[in-house]
Amino acid sequence: MDHADIEREYFIHVPEADADTAPLPLVLSFHGYTSTARTNLRYTGLQPLAESEKFIAVYPQGTVLASTGEPHWNSESSAIPSATDDIGFVETLLDELTETRNIDTDRIYAIGMSNGGMMSYLLACRLSQRIAAITSVTGTMTVDRNTCTGSRPVPVMQIHGIEDAVVPFNGSNSFPSIPATIEFWAQSNGCVGAAEETAIADITGDGYGGRRTRYLDCAQGTEVELITLDAVGHDWPIHVEGYRQHDIHAAEEIWNFLQRFSLYGGDT
C-alpha cells in the first residue's frame, strides 16, 4: 500500500472461519528497531492463537531510518529521531483493513516489541478513538507525556525483564523507567487504590520467577498491568516445549489481557 509517497508493506494472517462469521478482532504487531515484520511474525507466536481464538493478526513493516539504515517506527523518541508519519500510516492501514476485511472496529489492538512497544504507546496517545488496548514488550513510553491526551482511557499491559540492558527497567538517559510509564497510565486511566501484586511462578525451575502488578479499579473498566520477569533481558518471553523457556508465554498473556477490552470498556 502507498502512504505519503512511500510504498508500505505488511503481513496478514486471517483465521479460517465460516463465511457468516461475526466481525473479527484485529491485532497489530509492531517489530523492534533494526528488525522486520517477517521476523516479528516468526517469534511472537501470535498465529496459532489467531487461529484458535479467531482474530486477525497484522504485522506492519517499518521504514528505513535514513541516519542508520535500519528499520524503525517513529515513536516520537529522542533516541530514535525520525520524521516518518507512522501515525498516518497506521490510520491508512486501518482504513484499508476495515474496507477489505471483516474487522470488529471496536476491538482493534496494538502490541509491539521494543521500538514497536514504544509505537504502541504512541498509538494509545494519538489514536485512542480506534485502538481499544495495547501491550508493550521490552518497550517503554517515549512520547512526551504532556502531549498524550487521548479521547478515552486505554487499557495498557507492559511485559519487561529486570535484566533488560537495551531499554532498562529503571530507565536511562534515553528511555523513561518502566515504573514511571506504568504510573503515568494508572493516573491517566483514573485508577484508584493500591495495585494488586501477585507472584509469577518459577515454572522453568531456574530459581527465578517474576511479579504481576495490576491496577484494576480504573475508569470505564480499563486496567493497567505490569509483568516483571526476573533474570530476563531484552527478550520476547516464550514458553514452548523444546524451544526457549521462560516463565510466561507472552502471546497468551497478551491475548488474555487484550481480548477483554473494547472501545467501550472492559469485559467484552
Predicted feature residues:
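Acidic catalytic loop of the alpha/beta-hydrolase fold
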Residues: 164-167, 234-236
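A conserved short beta-strand
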Residues: 129-140, 155
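Alpha/beta-hydrolase fold active-site loops
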Residues: 25, 107, 154-155, 224
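Short beta-strand immediately N-terminal to the catalytic nucleophile in serine-hydrolase-like folds
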Residues: 110-112, 137
